[in-house]
């Protein structure tokens, strides 16, 4: 079964704030392997539209920097888990997350 993970980006790094991220990286993983990935421009979207992007793309996990309580609550109510207060190069953090999934 596949799983989608989203990482808000600022350049190649995890965006310091979910609500100000200009880009969203969505990665589809199946049996521990990446089978698809895409990057969406979200700079023009308001907060509710950003949340809708996650649900409409069937994201199950979000890895992000700072995120406000409203967004955490909204995502949690939709069954999306959030790993927050994470900083660093997005690809490095994603690979660590993926490695943990394979254990």
Where are these regions (language model features)?
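N-terminal basic/disordered segments at the start of proteins
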Residues: 1-22, 26-27
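Conserved functional loop/turn residues at catalytic and ligand-binding sites
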Residues: 58, 66, 79
